[in-house]
Amino acid sequence: MPFTGATRVLGIIGQPVSHSLSPLMQNAALQAMGLDYAYVPFAVEEDCLADAVRGLAALGVVGFNVTIPHKSAILPLLDRLSPEAELIGAANVVKREGSDLVGYNTDGTGFIQSLSEDLGFTPAGCRILVMGAGGAARAAVASLAGAGAASVVIANRSIARGEELSAAFRRHFIGTQFAAIPLDPENLNRCVQNFDLLVNTSSVGMGGTAFPGMDLSRMGPHGAVYDMVYVPAVTPLLAEAERCGIRYANGIGMLAAQGECALELWTGVRPPEGLMKACLMAALMS
């Protein structure tokens, strides 16, 4: 579809964004839906964020994704936040609504959708271990508690940060128990059988880097493992799950699902089911 003066603009801001697969899947969906939009990546340095947001608003951009390192820093630059973005403390989607820029967070929704579609896993009543305490962990913990998890334990190198995250969500989700433990392989190996789901939200394992010392053999076949890292497709953590006969999934489904939610927010139309995920998988296999 040729671009004209009537073409509406969507995009993604971050630094770096050259590696982002969002333009690929979003433009493929827009073309399949016959919508006159273009989705463009914008590299934005941290000290230029405010100028970039003002510029995008002035140019009439319909909406944009927000990625590292701007998901939290952008909040004070927006006019309003969705309840999810406010609770998580981060926005990965911005939509222009009248003269306002409104921040949303579709990461949690995408994560829960991927758990269901890729693992057949429902968090309600389950005991869950989340590794990491950064922005991705905040979205995961909030969505798991919101879906009725019985308990969420946060394992992080800085236990103080894990405890801070636990305390923040404990006030909002009284039906879920929260705790924090050190992200220490020996400690995790001893207690892994106590969990129904293990979620890695950290960057450990990205690019095939080793996940030191993990032994999931005590978890048993009832458990499940989710790694938000998706390059490589089978990370060291997922390879360990496979060795132990535990069902597992990587983060490609979450990336696709949050993108579907974002596109529906911007256009009011749900993209064809499975299209974004198929685009991503084809790109990663090529």
Curated annotation (Swiss-Prot):
GO biological process: amino acid biosynthetic process; aromatic amino acid family biosynthetic process; chorismate biosynthetic process; shikimate metabolic process
Cited InterPro entries: Aminoacid_DH-like_N_sf (IPR046346), NAD(P)-bd_dom_sf (IPR036291), SDH_C (IPR041121), Shikimate_DH (IPR011342), Shikimate_DH-bd_N (IPR013708), Shikimate_DH_fam (IPR022893), Shikm_DH/Glu-tRNA_Rdtase (IPR006151)
Pathway: Metabolic intermediate biosynthesis; chorismate biosynthesis; chorismate from D-erythrose 4-phosphate and phosphoenolpyruvate: step 4/7
CDD domains noted in UniProt: NAD_bind_Shikimate_DH
One function term, GO molecular function aspect: shikimate 3-dehydrogenase (NADP+) activity
PANTHER family assigned: BIFUNCTIONAL 3-DEHYDROQUINATE DEHYDRATASE_SHIKIMATE DEHYDROGENASE, CHLOROPLASTIC, SHIKIMATE DEHYDROGENASE
Protein name as it appears in the record: Shikimate dehydrogenase (NADP(+))
Species this chain originates from: Geobacter sulfurreducens (strain ATCC 51573 / DSM 12127 / PCA)
Top-level taxonomy: Bacteria, Pseudomonadati, Thermodesulfobacteriota, Desulfuromonadia, Geobacterales
Gene name tied to this protein: aroE
